[in-house]
Swiss-Prot record:
Residues 31-81 form the BPTI/Kunitz inhibitor domain. Residues 1-24 form the signal peptide. The record marks R41, A42 as: Reactive bond for trypsin. It comes from Daboia russelii. Pfam families: Kunitz_BPTI (PF00014). Serine protease inhibitor. Coiled coil: none annotated. This is Kunitz-type serine protease inhibitor 4. InterPro entries: Kunitz_BPTI, Kunitz_BPTI_sf, Prtase_inh_Kunz-CS, TFPI/VKTCI-like. The lineage of its organism: Eukaryota, Metazoa, Chordata, Craniata, Vertebrata.
Amino acid sequence: MSSGGLLLLLGLLTLWAELTPISGQDRPKFCHLPVDSGICRAHIPRFYYNPASNQCQGFIYGGCGGNANNFETRDQCRHTCGGK
């Protein structure tokens, strides 16, 4: 296969991976952790994945502690955990 054909195949596979929805079984386990603002008192807008609604929702992060279900942007949340 030529290098052009390989690049095309790689591009198509990448596009497919980006567009394929994440199923519940494929989500990282931390996506199912409850929202946790942490123990500090900062006021940082963040997003978490809510498995009950299958949505990435906003919350206020305190700045320390919490858990891994904590994303700087809605797009990061959607890319990692899926959802709307």
